[in-house]
């Protein structure tokens, strides 16, 4: 597995924060690093496989990656990221207690993926741009300024996370996308889902298309197919069982959609013919 080292990304040995844009981020094999990072998805779509679990990421997704996590990117489509790297929550010169603002693992569950709306994403970009402008300066005031900006970024992300920010349709759409991650196998009635998240059906279609580039049903099908591909690679369940588990009532229809999406059949993926290294 590829290991990324802080010496290759941080501007100096004393720097506690570094900015690493990926515009765009191509498919990238599984790796980990000796530093932590906050991945901010600017726009585009892709699959983020995090500690073996696949997540669909789009504009507004924020991922918190620790130094012992492993992850990869695949099936990217114009995926543009900004990575905010930091050595460790306790390696800041002027800040203490940052760990309390970061996601916390509870009973083996780590809430690694958050979502923010477009207006918050704009504020995030401004903070990141200010940090990036100061990267070449190593004096104490500049170091303190970068660390303060990092603290502001954490506060903004925490206050703007889905649990605390549902006042507009963009935030409700983000909550809907998070709900689909957990309920992708359910029979989805889009009228009922729109009502559940206080969106008109027209607004749901328009905003989801703007954010993901896909219609709601196309997005749901892709999400189901991504989950199915993960199970084909990492479980012993039959193709038919996996199809049903991922929300497809007809395994033949599932196989047709699967081949159309990935240019490989489910059996090809099961046998590793696509070249994926497990």
From Swiss-Prot:
It is found in: Cytoplasm. The keyword Protease does not apply. Binds DNA as a dimer. Residues 191-212, 239-262 bind DNA. InterPro entries: AraC-bd, AraC_XylS_family_regulators, Homeodomain-like_sf, HTH-like, HTH_AraC, HTH_AraC-typ_CS, RhaR_RhaS-like_N, RmlC-like_jellyroll. One of its GO terms (biological process) is positive regulation of DNA-templated transcription. GO terms for molecular function: DNA-binding transcription factor activity; sequence-specific DNA binding. One of its GO terms (cellular component) is cytoplasm. The record marks 241, 250 as: Interaction with sigma-70. Gene3D superfamilies: Homeodomain-like, Jelly Rolls. Activates expression of the rhaBAD and rhaT operons. Residues 174-272 form the HTH araC/xylS-type domain. This is HTH-type transcriptional activator RhaS. It holds the Pfam family HTH_18. Keywords: Activator, Cytoplasm, DNA-binding, Repeat, Rhamnose metabolism, Transcription, Transcription regulation. The lineage of its organism: Bacteria, Pseudomonadati, Pseudomonadota, Gammaproteobacteria, Enterobacterales. Signal peptide: none annotated.
């Amino acid at each position: 597995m590829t290991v990324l080292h802080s010496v290759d990304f941080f501007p100096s040995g004393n720097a506690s924060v570094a900015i690493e844009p990926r515009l765009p981020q191509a498919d990238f094999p599984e790796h980990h690093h000796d530093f932590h990072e906050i991945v901010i998805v600017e726009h585009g779509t892709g699959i983020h496989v995090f500690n073996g679990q696949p997540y669909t990421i789009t504009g507004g997704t924020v991922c918190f990656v620790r130094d012992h996590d492993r992850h990869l990117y695949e099936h990217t489509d114009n995926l543009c990221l900004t990575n905010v790297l930091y050595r460790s929550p306790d390696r800041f010169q002027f800040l203490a207690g940052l760990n309390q603002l970061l996601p916390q693992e509870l009973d083996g569950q780590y809430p690694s993926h958050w979502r923010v709306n477009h207006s918050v994403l704009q504020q995030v970009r401004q903070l990141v741009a200010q940090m990036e402008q100061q990267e070449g300066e190593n004096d104490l005031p500049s170091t303190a300024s970068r660390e303060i900006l990092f603290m502001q970024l954490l506060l903004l992300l925490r206050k703007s996370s889905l649990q605390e920010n549902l006042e507009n349709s963009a935030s409700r759409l983000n909550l809907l996308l998070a709900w689909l991650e957990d309920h992708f196998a359910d029979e989805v009635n889009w009228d009922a889902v729109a009502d559940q998240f206080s969106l008109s059906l027209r607004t749901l279609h328009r905003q989801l298309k703007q954010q993901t580039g896909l219609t709601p049903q196309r997005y749901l099908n892709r999400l189901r197919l991504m989950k199915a591909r993960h199970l084909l690679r990492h479980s012993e369940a039959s193709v038919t069982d996996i199809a049903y588990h991922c929300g497809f009532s007809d395994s033949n229809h599932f196989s047709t959609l699967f081949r159309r999406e990935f240019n490989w059949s489910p059996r090809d993926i099961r046998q590793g013919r696509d070249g994926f290294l497990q």
